[in-house]
Design a protein with these regions (language model features):
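Glycine-rich phosphate-binding loop of ATP-dependent small-molecule kinases
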Residues: 1-328
Length: 328
């Protein structure tokens, strides 16, 4: 039997094809995934739902006469760039709950999300705006978001309850830096900060599948995929252009690969403390590029019945080469 990959960090710029890759994998039989891609049946974690729900919280705060808590505006970047690290802390928590098969049972999913957001902000040294809301206003905001938050929490709970034996976890995220930035990117931008924030439990089990597209192509596809009513959708949301240029104008994955002392890996140095002393822990995560500069993935957004065999074959072959590299 081929080696089953434990955890895949599915990373790339927005609209590069990450979600389409996930959808394509979901269309395959377990035998195809195992034999061609070294994958067990997949479990999925993604930080985009939190990006969307923070926008929704800001919408409700504005509707009640308050300022935005998380963003400079509905189509603008985060108020504090360290919110990128907040998203990783939320993924760390989701991962811990998944591995523990934990069922999160709360009276209000929206109130629970507010508490989680504040706790994650505190971990990276940011203010906790939801805790400062007047009680009656917080109840109104929670009521407006309860249905959306409940859907997300229920989905996580359903996944947490599943048997993890022989499964592959796929964690999806996009990171980058401003157009024209020099490397290394300054924290908290880029994948370097994401790797510095991810739980060691994840790093010890993970490999990186990097979906490679040019930033200009990422911007084009971002506009192409967007739908005005699709901001809550993984496949059809669109990132504002200010964010695309200011936060995703480049990324540092290629640079990190070049800096590694082991070919085919990214090297991550983490400072740890033990016995009242600091030391360095080094991780070498296997990494493979799936070259999507020729756009092998857009067709996956359409109905599966419309997929053309030649397009499927090209996508399958490209992914197989990348996963074979990760499996060694």
């Amino acid at each position: 039997m081929s080696q089953i990959l434990d955890t895949i960090l599915l990373f790339s710029l927005p609209a590069s094809g990450k979600s389409e890759v996930r959808r394509y994998l979901a269309s395959l039989t377990p035998e195809q995934c195992r034999n061609d891609f070294h994958l067990g049946p997949t479990l999925q974690l993604d930080d985009y739902p939190y990006v969307h729900l923070m926008h929704r919280l800001d919408d409700e705060l504005k509707a009640h006469g308050l300022g935005y808590a998380y963003y400079h505006g509905p189509n603008r970047p985060f108020r504090d760039n360290w919110t990128w690290a907040v998203l990783i802390e939320l993924l760390n928590e989701d991962h811990a709950n998944l591995m523990a098969s934990r069922q999160v049972e709360v009276a209000s999913a929206a109130q629970h999300l507010m508490d989680r957001l504040d706790a994650a902000h505190a971990k990276v040294g940011l203010a906790q705006p939801m805790g400062d809301l007047p009680h009656r206003l917080r109840l109104k905001v929670a009521q407006a978001l309860e249905a959306e938050c409940r859907r997300e929490l229920d989905a996580l709970n359903r996944q947490n309850a599943q048997d993890k034996t022989g499964r592959t976890l796929v964690i999806e995220a996009a990171r980058g830096g401003a157009h024209g930035s020099a490397f290394p990117l300054c924290p908290p931008h880029g994948y370097e900060t994401a790797f510095q924030t991810l739980s060691p439990v994840i790093l010890e089990r993970a490999a990186v599948l990097y979906v490679w597209v040019d930033p200009a192509e990422s911007r084009r596809k971002n506009l192409e995929r967007g739908r005005p009513d699709g901001q809550g959708s993984i496949l059809h949301h669109s990132v504002p252009m200010e964010v695309m240029l200011g936060q995703y104008g480049c990324d540092d994955m290629g640079w990190l690969m070049e800096q590694s002392d082991r070919p085919g890996t990214v090297r991550i140095e983490r400072i740890t403390s033990q016995n009242n002393a600091y030391s360095t822990k080094v991780y070498h995560l296997p990494v493979a590029r799936f070259d999507n500069r020729g756009d092998l993935t857009t067709f996956v957004r359409t109905d599966e019945a419309l997929w053309q065999p030649a397009a499927v074959e090209a996508l399958h072959a490209g992914l197989k080469a990348a996963f074979d590299s990760l499996a060694g």
